[in-house]
Amino acid sequence: MQFVLVLNCGSSSLKFAVMNPTSGDVLLNGTAERLGHDVGSLTVKDESGKAVQEIKPGTHAQALELIVETLKTKNLMDKIAAVGHRLVHGGEFFKESVVINNEVREKVAECIRLAPLHNPANITGIEAALKVFPKLPQVGVFDTAFHQQMPEKAYLYPLPRKFYEEFHIRRYGFHGTSFRYIASQLESVTGLKNPRTVVCHLGNGGSLAAIKDGHSVDTTMGLTPLEGIVHGTRCGDIDPAIIQILQKQFHISATEMNEILWKKSGLLGLSGISNDCRSLEEAMAEGNEAAIRALEVYCYRLAKHIAAQMVALNGCDALVFTGGIGENSAFVRANTMEQLAFLGFELDKKANEETSRGKQGKISTANSKPVWVIPTNEELLIARDTAQLSGMTR
């Protein structure tokens, strides 16, 4: 039996999973954190539980070396047939997953200007994997690829045309691998053939996609993952003039402003408590006004974006919640859908409250437009793309 090693390389983290691309079974997975610091950590999980190891000085390359040592200990090293990489931004170069070669690496590097926080880390992961697995095929699966079929009216910004023509400034969208996985499950789960579906991928970062005939026709994130709904620490949609006003009023540098927009806003900024929805729901239950306010803004803006995605579909046959918040927060689902009752949505309270922690199910009433919770599995889709493109499966 041959397996795929799936890598998801962030600026200070590296997530991995060893998967059977056919069955979807995960033999081993884990996360290296605090990379780039003096001391990082690697948490590895298998059937027997989890183990935590220190990494010094905590680089991506050393994290991968430690992962390889773990694979050897588990007698899995010789069973890895290919490596699949989650890559954030492929620009207009990539409309589907690809085998990574020198040309692909160069184009991913070209997209750094579009994703300066994400693509450098992705490249670091590729380089580290090529050193450790020089003879194995490496496959790149892009977050942006699924949205490359959006119509021009959905991806253009109302800016001077030259910015698009010369610099490719446009809306790209993200979470594409998650949306593509959900799209692949829609007919078998809902019983509907090619339903017009709004999918809500809600986590620390969140976005929506309007899916028609299996393709994305609109989404809420834009040039970067900053646009769209309220996120955990990112602001989502704001008036762009706010940036210049704040910089002038408070003498904030561009770097500091970036830090505010990306890491100090969203649920964290609104509440002053946490970016974690679970923590805010606990605080809300205790009557904390800041937590109540933050969640009200989150759900209200989410409801508005759901309605907007329905415009792109000229209606809606089904709505799906996925991602950490989407799969587990009965409160967010209920509060959001109450605001969309006028569009024909009504949740079954019992079904909504019982559907979490990996459960899949319909959470709407019989008279409602169907609302589903479908757990996403980005790693499985990356593993299957990798297996197919590397020749493991046909």
From Swiss-Prot:
Residues recorded as binding ATP, renumbered to this chain, are 15, 201-205, 276-278, 324-328
Pathway-wise, it operates in: Metabolic intermediate biosynthesis; acetyl-CoA biosynthesis; acetyl-CoA from acetate: step 1/2
**Name this polypeptide is given:** Acetate kinase
Naming one, the record's GO cellular component terms include: cytosol
Question: What PANTHER family does the database record attribute to this sequence?
Answer: ACETATE KINASE
Q: Does the keyword Magnesium apply?
A: yes
The entry's free-text remark on the cofactor is: Mg(2+). Can also accept Mn(2+).
Q: Which gene encodes it?
A: ackA
Which Gene3D superfamilies has this protein been placed in? 3.30.420.40
Q: Principal localization?
A: cytoplasm
Note the site residues: Transition state stabilizer.
Answer: 175, 234
Q: Which organism is it from?
A: Dichelobacter nodosus (strain VCS1703A)
